[in-house]
Amino acid sequence: MAEASGLVTVCLLGYLLSAECAVFLDRENATKILSRPKRYNSGKLEEFVRGNLERECIEEKCSFEEAREVFENTEKTTEFWKQYVDGDQCESNPCLNDGVCKDDINSYECWCRAGFEGKNCELDVTCNIKNGRCKQFCKLGPDNKVVCSCTTGYQLAEDQRSCEPAVPFPCGRVSVPHISMTRTRAETLFSNMDYENSTEVEKILDNVTQPLNDFTRVVGGKDAKPGQFPWQVLLNGKVDAFCGGSIINEKWVVTAAHCIEPDVKITIVAGEHNTEKREHTEQKRNVIRTILHHSYNATINKYNHDIALLELDEPLTLNSYVTPICIADREYSNIFLKFGSGYVSGWGRVFNKGRSASILQYLKVPLVDRATCLRSTKFTIYNNMFCAGFHEGGKDSCQGDSGGPHVTEVEGISFLTGIISWGEECAMKGKYGIYTKVSRYVNWIKEKTKLT
């Protein structure tokens, strides 16, 4: 029995020794067996996981200093900390128009691409949208940011968007105190800008039948107040008040070419209001030179390129009753015209074949779309002309108003957009007034008159 018991003891000891040899492995094999598999960590924090970050800040709450020990870099720690404290504020993609979102603690910042501003890059500040919020002219600078500018005689205000007078009597501005301006403001109209193809080839015909009447009138208009249209001038020649015109600067007036007759002496009267009495605001000047547009040819068509310049013998004295009209560049002259309505003025006939007005008349006329304009007449409407007026008739420019202004007001400043040219009768139903489109001649005007 004792022998059997000893044999069992020896066997157990041998088994334990063999088992011990199987349990204790070398270091390399033991590391393979005992290494903990990496736990999956989803989301933006994965890129920050280094060293003990997961143990320090994900499995447990950590402080900024503890996270700093892991990153060993303040900038990277700060980026991690912004998301760690309150989550990713950029997760909802709040930045519009391809803006880049940068997360922050309890907030975010949008880095906007050129042409956009605002908390979420929601404001389009390119010139194509509401004129870049500029009150007159807009262009993009070298960095693609909006740069506002003003016409001659004005300067940018502190907001760098509005324009304020830089001279005592700047163009297009009514300065007579008692006149209350009720014209349409342009700030809500810039969003409707419609750019016309300025390279469109003009239609030229060799023989065109002439319409019955020059436009020398404002039919259905209202009496203007003294100084309400201080750029308006009266032309006297063989007869008085045969045409109108507009002051460009102290030495030059623009009118219609068909108003000019060879060898006929012309005088202009600026500051005129009531032709039947002297009001001590009038200034008379002699015309010493006339310049017809180089494309004007009355033998082919009396009203095509119907524009002329008159040089005065002495400069006009600018004041509240004698003020030049503003002339924009070609692009903006066309844009302003497309605002949809303008003002015409003159001393022409107050009804068809009737008497001429003694007091300056004015009328607000809507722009007529080109298709309607073409359908309204058998005569040729060239691309350098436009139609304005009322389909129902009763209101129009008329005989005696030719050469006078069609102006568009922009933020209280009036710009020349047309010249009264011709029409079929006056104020007839279904007929419109035809005007010379000033945008086509801006460069020529500025070149000849040295207008800046």
Swiss-Prot record:
Q: Which family does it belong to?
A: Belongs to the peptidase S1 family.
MF terms (GO), sorted A to Z: calcium ion binding; endopeptidase activity; serine-type endopeptidase activity
- Give the signal sequence positions: 1-21
Binding of Ca(2+) 1 occurs at Y40, E46, E56, E60
Gene3D superfamilies per the UniProt record, alphabetical:
Coagulation Factor IX, Laminin, Trypsin-like serine proteases
Which residues are Mg(2+) 2-binding? E65, E69
Cell compartment(s), UniProt? Secreted
PTM remark: Activated by factor XIa, which excises the activation peptide. The propeptide can also be removed by snake venom protease. Activated by coagulation factor VIIa-tissue factor (F7-F3) complex in calcium-dependent manner. The iron and 2-oxoglutarate dependent 3-hydroxylation of aspartate and asparagine is (R) stereospecific within EGF domains.
Q: Which UniProt keywords apply?
A: Blood coagulation, Calcium, Cleavage on pair of basic residues, Disease variant, Disulfide bond, EGF-like domain, Gamma-carboxyglutamic acid, Glycoprotein, Hemophilia, Hemostasis, Hydrolase, Hydroxylation, Magnesium, Metal-binding, Phosphoprotein, Protease, Repeat, Secreted, Serine protease, Signal, Sulfation, Zymogen
Q: Where in this chain does the record put each Peptidase S1 domain?
A: 218-450
| GO cellular component entries | extracellular space
Q: What is known of its domains?
A: Calcium binds to the gamma-carboxyglutamic acid (Gla) residues in the Gla domain. Calcium can also bind, with stronger affinity, to another site beyond the Gla domain. Under physiological ion concentrations, Ca(2+) is displaced by Mg(2+) from some of the gammaglutamate residues in the N-terminal Gla domain. This leads to a subtle conformation change that may affect the interaction with its binding protein.
Gene name per UniProt: F9
Q: Which PROSITE patterns match?
A: ASX_HYDROXYL (PS00010), EGF_1 (PS00022), EGF_2 (PS01186), EGF_3 (PS50026), EGF_CA (PS01187), GLA_1 (PS00011), GLA_2 (PS50998), TRYPSIN_DOM (PS50240)
Residues binding Ca(2+) 3 are: E47, E56, E66, E69
What is the scientific name of the source organism?
Canis lupus familiaris
In the UniProt record, does the keyword Signal occur?
yes
UniProt: Ca(2+) 8 binding residues:
E272, N274, E279, E282
Q: Which residues carry this modification: 4-carboxyglutamate?
A: E46, E47, E54, E56, E59, E60, E65, E66, E69, E72, E75, E79
This chain's protein is named Coagulation factor IX
GO biological process terms, semicolon-separated = blood coagulation; proteolysis; zymogen activation
One Pfam short name: EGF
Ranges for domain EGF-like come to: 86-122, 123-164
- Quick one: which residues bind Ca(2+) 5? E65, E69
EC number per UniProt: 3.4.21.22
Report the record's disulfide bonds. C57-C62, C90-C101, C95-C110, C112-C121, C127-C138, C134-C148, C150-C163, C171-C326, C243-C259, C373-C387, C398-C426
List modified residues, type Phosphothreonine.
T199
